[in-house]
A protein has these predicted regions:
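Small-polar-interrupted transmembrane alpha-helices in polytopic inner-membrane proteins
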Residues: 30, 71-79
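Short linear sequence motifs
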Residues: 1, 12, 23, 156-158, ...
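Hydrophobic transmembrane alpha-helices
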Residues: 8-69
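Non-catalytic, surface-exposed connector residues within folded enzymatic/regulatory domains
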Residues: 70-71, 179
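Juxtamembrane loop-helix boundary motifs flanking transmembrane segments in multi-pass membrane proteins
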Residues: 8-16, 72, 156-160, 164
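Short, functional N-terminal and low-complexity linear motifs
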Residues: 21-27, 70, 102, 150-155
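Membrane-embedded alpha-helical hairpins and interfacial helices in multi-pass inner-membrane proteins
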Residues: 38-47, 76-97, 102-198
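Short, charged juxtamembrane terminal tails flanking transmembrane helices
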Residues: 2-17, 186-198
C-alpha cells in the first residue's frame, strides 16, 4: 500500500514541531559547515574534485526523516551563498537547483534504506556522482575553464569525457567524506543514543 507524502518523508513518525525543529537545526548546521569548508578548503568545496566536509552530516538521514528537508534546505542555502560569494551569477543556479536535487534524492533514499546504514549513506555518493557532473561542464565553461581539470582534455565537444571524469572525481570525493567522516559520525550518534528509534 502506498502511503501519503507525509508518511513517505517521515513526518508521521514524530511530532510535527520536533520534525520542523530538527530540520531547521540540520539545515543550519549543513549550510554553516559548507560555508566554513568553502572558506578553509576554497576550491575543494565546489568543482570537479570536491571534498565538501559538510557532506559528513548527510548521514543523519539514516536516523531522522527531518534530515530530508533539513539537508535539502541547507544545501540550497549553501549553494545560494556560494553563488553570491563566488560571483557565478545565473550559472550558479545550476548548482542551486540540481546540486540540491541530488542532496534531496540522496536523503530520501538514505531514509528509506536506513536499516542498512552502510548502503543507505552510499545513496549520497551515487546521487552526487551521477547528477553534479551532468551540469558541471556548463558551469566550468561559463567560469572560464576550457579543459578538464588536471588533464589536457578540452571541455568543448568533450561532454562525455568531462561527465565521466566528474562521475569518478565527485564520487571519490563524496565517498571519502561520507565513509571516512560520516560513517563514524553515524556510529557515534547511535552509540550516544541521539538517534531516534525507527
Amino acid at each position: 500500500m502506498v502511503g501519503t507524502a507525509s508518511s513517505f518523508f517521515g513526518v508521521a513518525e514524530m511530532p510535527r514541531t520536533r520534525y520542523i525543529a530538527q530540520a531547521g537545526v540540520i539545515a543550519a548546521l549543513y549550510a554553516a559547515a559548507t560555508l566554513i569548508t568553502m572558506m578553509l578548503l576554497q576550491g575543494l568545496a565546489w568543482g570537479p574534485v570536491q571534498f565538501r566536509i559538510s557532506e559528513a552530516l548527510c548521514v543523519v538521514a539514516a536516523i531522522t526523516p527531518a534530515a530530508i528537508p533539513g539537508l535539502t534546505v541547507g544545501c540550497v542555502i549553501a549553494n545560494v551563498a556560494n553563488m553570491v560569494i563566488s560571483g557565478t551569477g545565473a550559472l550558479g543556479m545550476l548548482d542551486v537547483v540540481f546540486g540540491s536535487a541530488a542532496t534531496f534524492i540522496g536523503a530520501v533514499l538514505c531514509w528509506r534504506l536506513r536499516k542498512r546504514p552502510a548502503i543507505a549513506i552510499g545513496c549520497f555518493v551515487a546521487a552526487n556522482a551521477l547528477i553534479v557532473p551532468a551540469y558541471l561542464p556548463i558551469l566550468l565553461q561559463g567560469l572560464g575553464f576550457y579543459t578538464i581539470p588536471f588533464t589536457d582534455i578540452s571541455i568543448d565537444g568533450a561532454y562525455l569525457p568531462m561527465y565521466l571524469f566528474g562521475v569518478i572525481s565527485t564520487g571519490i570525493g563524496e565517498a571519502v567524506v561520507i565513509y571516512a567522516l560520516g560513517l563514524p559520525l553515524l556510529t557515534a550518534l547511535k552509540r550516544a543514543n541521539i538517534a531516534p528509534s525507527s
